[in-house]
């Protein structure tokens, strides 16, 4: 079992909903990509799942148990977009903060905590940067560090808000590959917000296209992301290209 969301609706004002009746199911090891136009409510929806914003109606179930939000579940890691760091913490310091819930307010990190933090950095391929000062790091390095901090929490559910934003194409590809690897290896339910349908095609098992009112489209990636749906939801003309003829088990899109 995994995560089930039923009928989630939200609005900042009464009788004026930003989105309504969002449903999806996500099994362990699966990745769900959430897409939609700017301002449609993708980030707000993630905040509703996390309990940062309070949804107006709907239900959330984790492994068959109803929860009011995913923070209540306790085994969910959330990586927000555009995280800014104004203090000279090292990468290791930041990843250890992911252990705060288990360490306690007045306790110091144990040897095991530090070992787990270094292991998470190693899984992200940045163990050699453990003493790197965050204010001196690149956007790609910081994104990997935040993933390590999420991973050290040993989450069952991982929520990432535009993890590939502000990265060049190579780093976008590397981040997405790591997310896929983590979801499969650690059996994590993973949700990513993205603006790019091609990135969803590359990484996601399922897609949720958020539209106005209840005009949402949810299902397997290849069934949901079609030339017609991309035109409808993004107002662009696109060509879907299957890469199997090139020996690659993947497909992508180009705008035309």
What are these regions (language model features)?
Residues 1-5, 9-21, 28, 54, ...:
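A short, flexible loop at the N-terminus of ABC-type nucleotide-binding domains that lies
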Residues 35-37:
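The feature captures the beta-strand-to-loop junction immediately N-terminal to the Walker
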Residues 58-72:
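Conserved ABC transporter NBD signature motif
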Residues 96, 111-129:
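Conserved ABC ATPase "signature" region
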Residues 133-137, 141:
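Conserved ABC ATPase signature
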Residues 158-162:
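Catalytic Walker B motif of ABC-type/P-loop ATPase nucleotide-binding domains
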């Amino acid at each position: 079992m995994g995560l089930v969301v039923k009928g989630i609706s939200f609005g900042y004002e009464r009788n004026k909903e930003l989105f309504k009746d969002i449903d999806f199911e996500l099994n362990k090891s699966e990745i769900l990509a959430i897409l939609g136009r700017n301002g449609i409510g993708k980030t707000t929806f993630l905040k509703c799942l996390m309990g940062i914003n309070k949804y107006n109606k709907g239900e959330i179930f984790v492994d068959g148990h109803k929860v009011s939000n995913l923070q209540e579940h306790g085994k969910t890691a959330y990586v927000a977009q555009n995280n800014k760091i104004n203090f000279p913490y090292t990468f290791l310091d930041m990843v250890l903060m992911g252990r705060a819930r288990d360490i306690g307010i007045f306790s110091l990190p144990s040897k095991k905590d530090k070992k787990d933090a270094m292991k998470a950095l190693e899984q992200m391929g940045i163990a050699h940067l453990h003493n790197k000062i965050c204010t001196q790091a690149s956007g790609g390095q910081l994104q990997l560090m935040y993933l390590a901090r999420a991973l050290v929490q040993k989450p069952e559910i991982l929520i990432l808000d535009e993890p590939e934003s502000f990265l060049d194409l190579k780093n976008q590809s590397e981040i997405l590959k790591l997310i896929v690897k983590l979801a499969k290896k650690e059996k994590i339910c993973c949700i990513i917000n993205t603006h790019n349908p091609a990135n969803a095609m590359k990484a996601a098992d399922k897609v949720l296209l958020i539209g106005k009112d209840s005009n949402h489209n949810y299902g397997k990636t290849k069934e949901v992301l079609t030339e017609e749906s991309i035109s409808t939801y993004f107002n662009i003309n696109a060509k879907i290209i299957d890469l199997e003829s090139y020996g690659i088990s993947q497909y992508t899109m180009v705008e035309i």
